[in-house]
């Protein structure tokens, strides 16, 4: 009788664990994090701007595909990052940070939306080891509304801009970028 009681308890514990695991992959997890960060320019040792990266929204864990984040990633000094953001996936190749804003209204008063790409976010799941590479035309337009004409530019590891949360110095930022394989070695 004791043995069957233990088996029942083990079955109930196993079922409870299965339910918790199932819920973890079905129910999105709310996030509201603020990270102190720095922005650097790879070819300019004197360029270092302190900023904040605010992340709020819902994190979706996935067993068979990349995890997904649905919410906002706001970078101080980049005005258009306050706009609606497209869903972001945690891919090994990074994911574009795409924001949608109202560009103008047509003759009937309907909103015409445009897209703003800040850059690409490289991160492990749960925003661990996060780095943002900033497309070249964005730093020029930081506080001016960010509405560049045409392409948002590109990025390269020689003279690109990077936003690195949890780094306090240029050396720390370069080490994180090297560890994340975004640059080959400290320039």
What are these regions (language model features)?
Residues 1-7:
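Short, Lys/Arg-rich N-terminal segment immediately upstream of the first membrane anchor
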Residues 8-28:
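Hydrophobic membrane-insertion alpha-helices, especially the h-region
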Residues 17-18, 48-57, 109-116:
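Charged, amphipathic alpha-helical segments
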Residues 25-34, 66-69:
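A short, compositionally biased
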Residues 31-45:
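Tryptophan-anchored aromatic micro-motifs
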Residues 42-47, 79, 106-112:
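Short, solvent-exposed secondary-structure boundary motifs
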Residues 45, 50-101:
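Extracytoplasmic/periplasmic/luminal assembly and interaction segments
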Residues 87-187:
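Non-cytosolic head/periplasmic domains of membrane-anchored proteins
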């Amino acid at each position: 009788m004791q043995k069957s009681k233990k088996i029942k308890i083990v079955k109930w514990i196993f079922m409870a664990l299965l339910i918790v695991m199932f819920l973890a992959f079905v129910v999105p997890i709310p996030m509201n994090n603020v990270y102190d960060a720095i922005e650097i320019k790879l070819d300019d040792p004197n360029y270092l701007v302190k900023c904040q990266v605010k992340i709020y929204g819902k994190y979706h864990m996935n067993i068979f595909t990349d995890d997904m984040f649905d919410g906002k990633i706001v970078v101080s000094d980049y005005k258009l990052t306050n706009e609606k953001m497209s869903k972001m996936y945690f891919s090994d190749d990074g994911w574009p940070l795409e924001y949608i804003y109202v560009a103008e209204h047509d003759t009937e008063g309907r909103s015409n939306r445009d897209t703003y790409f800040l850059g690409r976010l490289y991160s492990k799941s749960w925003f661990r080891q996060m780095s943002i590479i900033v497309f070249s035309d964005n730093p020029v337009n930081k506080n001016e509304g960010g509405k560049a004409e045409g392409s948002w530019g590109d990025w390269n590891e020689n003279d690109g801009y990077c936003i690195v949360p949890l780094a306090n110095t240029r050396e720390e930022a370069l080490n994180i970028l090297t560890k994340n394989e975004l640059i080959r070695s400290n320039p």
